[in-house]
Structure formats: structure tokens, C-alpha cells
């Protein structure tokens, strides 16, 4: 069973990548399970053509003793199995705790043993790597982590913070960094910035997803790009990315950038923006 996590800043394109990679891997004949670990519960939206009941909602409505696998596992596009952890009501409780509860419930119900997926993908919010959102790292639920980022300074800052969490648990032999997914959707689209960041943290770029209006059109229809435009160039980019990650054997314990290193990278971005728009 191939298991990996996708982390990244909120709104950076994690779910876009996860949905399309899952669809691509399923298209290739693999049985895929996607576990959304984001309180927005939208990780599987394009696979399911809408939202599904979350583990936490079902937990609150039925109680854990009455829950069944079919209450929380749904089958979406290309036969991809979908689960959403969900979160507390706004202003109440801890979203990270929701991830912990969801992961525990999947274990209790024997989801992995019964479904026997070939691939499990965890889609995890990475703005703050607290105890809940770091659960897949702590419990070694996955073999490696992939971080989605753009050239935006705050996205890189979040990616660097995630690397700190991976380093903490990686040094205990629990997890490793597989690489960076470059989402080319920020104002500054400069691969050299990401190359510099990747070199600094001792990792690799797994692939670049360029900006495309096809992705936007697909998501407005609540579809993956693989479903909406299967023969498009951007769909093939997602297929290449999915295969690259599935086959990847090269992992590292990252070396997060220091504050000074981040400042220097930010200055490089500012210089590129100035040159581009002045």
C-alpha cells in the first residue's frame, strides 16, 4: 500500500492536486482512498461533485458506537474512495482535534483493512503544524510528505514550517520529505525561486502545475481536470505528477531555512516583482 501526505498553506491548491492525482492513479487501475484532513471539508469536492458528510458530523449525529464504514466512506469519480474528517463549528473546539478523531475512527472501523486500497492520500492543511494536523506524521500513517507551494512568500514560509515538523518526526524515524509540488499560480511565476528553496531544504521538485483556465472551469463544475478535460495538456501534467510521486523512492529529512535564509529568499522575490512590474 502506497501512502503519502500532501501538505500546504490553505488555498494553495492542495485539493486540486490531490483530486487530480487520485483520479489519475485510479484511471491507471489503482484502488485509491483520499482522506481529507481540512476543516473546510472540500478535499474531495471535485471527486464527489460536491461535499460529503464528514467523520466529525457523523460522530456528533450518530455517536461512535453506531457508525459504519458506509456512513463516512463515499465512492467518487473513477471509483476513488473519499473521506472527509471535517471540523468543529466556527469558534468552537479545535480543528486539529478533528483530524485526530477522524484518524482514530478510520482505524476503529477497519477502513484500511476492508477497502484494501493500493494508494492512500492524506490532504492536510499546513498553515499551522499543530498536534492534530501533524497526526499523520506522528503516527507514521504515511511513508512520505509532499508540500504544495507557489512563489508567494507566505506560501514558502508555510512550506518551511511544515519542513520543521517533518524534521522533528523524521529524526525519530517516522516520516520523510518526498519533495515539493510547484503550483505556478502566484503573481511571480519563477521556477528559479522554488529551485533555490528546494536546494536550501535538501529536497527535490516533483513537478510543476502551470496556471490554467481549464482547472478553473473544471472546479466551477465540481470536477477534476482529469474528468472535465481528459485529453488536455494540463490533465497530462497531473498524470505525470501522480506517477512521479507514486514511483518516488528518494526521500530526505529536510533542512528548513533559517529566518535569515527566508529573508534572503523573500528579497529575491521582491526583486523579481519589481523588475516585472516597474
UniProtKB/Swiss-Prot annotation:
Record's function text: The key enzymatic reactions in nitrogen fixation are catalyzed by the nitrogenase complex, which has 2 components: the iron protein and the molybdenum-iron protein.
Similarity annotation: Belongs to the NifH/BchL/ChlL family.
Cofactor(s) needed: [4Fe-4S] cluster
Superkingdom of the organism of origin: Archaea
PTM description: The reversible ADP-ribosylation of Arg-97 inactivates the nitrogenase reductase and regulates nitrogenase activity.
Self-association state and partner proteins as the record states: Homodimer.
Lineage of source species: Archaea, Methanobacteriati, Methanobacteriota, Methanomada group, Methanococci
UniProtKB keywords: 4Fe-4S, ADP-ribosylation, ATP-binding, Iron, Iron-sulfur, Metal-binding, Nitrogen fixation, Nucleotide-binding, Oxidoreductase
Protein name: Nitrogenase iron protein
Family annotation (HAMAP family): NifH
Comment on bound cofactor: Binds 1 [4Fe-4S] cluster per dimer.
InterPro entries hit by this protein: NifH/chlL_CS, NifH/frxC, Nitrogenase_Fe_NifH, P-loop_NTPase
Organism this protein belongs to: Methanococcus voltae
Catalytic activities: N2 + 8 reduced [2Fe-2S]-[ferredoxin] + 16 ATP + 16 H2O = H2 + 8 oxidized [2Fe-2S]-[ferredoxin] + 2 NH4(+) + 16 ADP + 16 phosphate + 6 H(+)
Record gene name: nifH
Amino acid at each position: 500500500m502506497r501512502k503519502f501526505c500532501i501538505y500546504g498553506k490553505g488555498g494553495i491548491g492542495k485539493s486540486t492536486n490531490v483530486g487530480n492525482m487520485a483520479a489519475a492513479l485510479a484511471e491507471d487501475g489503482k484502488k485509491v482512498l483520499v482522506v481529507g484532513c481540512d476543516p473546510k471539508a472540500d478535499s474531495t469536492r471535485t471527486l464527489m461533485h460536491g461535499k460529503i458528510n464528514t467523520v466529525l458530523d457523523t460522530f456528533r449525529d450518530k455517536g461512535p458506537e453506531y457508525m459504519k464504514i458506509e456512513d463516512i466512506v463515499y465512492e467518487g469519480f473513477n471509483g476513488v474512495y473519499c473521506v472527509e474528517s471535517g471540523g468543529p463549528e466556527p469558534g468552537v473546539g479545535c480543528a486539529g482535534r478533528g483530524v485526530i478523531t477522524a484518524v482514530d475512527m478510520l482505524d476503529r472501523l477497519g477502513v484500511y483493512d476492508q477497502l484494501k486500497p493500493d494508494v492512500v492520500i492524506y490532504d492536510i492543511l499546513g498553515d499551522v503544524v499543530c498536534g492534530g494536523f501533524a497526526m499523520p506524521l506522528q503516527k507514521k500513517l504515511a511513508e512520505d510528505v509532499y508540500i504544495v507551494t507557489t512563489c508567494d512568500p507566505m506560501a514558502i514560509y508555510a512550506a518551511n514550517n511544515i519542513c520543521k515538523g517533518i524534521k522533528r518526526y523524521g529524526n525519530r524515524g517516522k516520516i520523510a520529505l518526498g519533495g515539493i509540488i510547484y503550483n505556478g499560480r502566484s503573481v511571480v511565476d519563477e521556477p528559479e525561486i522554488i529551485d533555490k528553496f528546494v536546494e536550501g531544504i535538501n529536497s527535490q521538485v516533483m513537478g510543476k502545475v502551470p496556471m490554467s483556465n481549464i482547472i478553473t472551469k473544471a472546479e466551477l463544475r465540481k470536477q477534476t481536470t482529469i474528468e472535465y478535460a481528459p485529453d488536455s495538456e494540463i490533465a497530462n501534467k497531473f498524470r505525470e505528477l501522480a506517477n512521479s510521486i507514486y514511483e518516488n523512492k528518494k526521500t530526505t529529512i529536510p533542512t528548513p531555512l533559517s529566518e535569515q535564509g527566508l529573508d534572503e529568499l523573500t528579497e529575491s522575490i521582491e526583486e523579481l516583482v519589481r523588475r516585472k512590474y516597474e
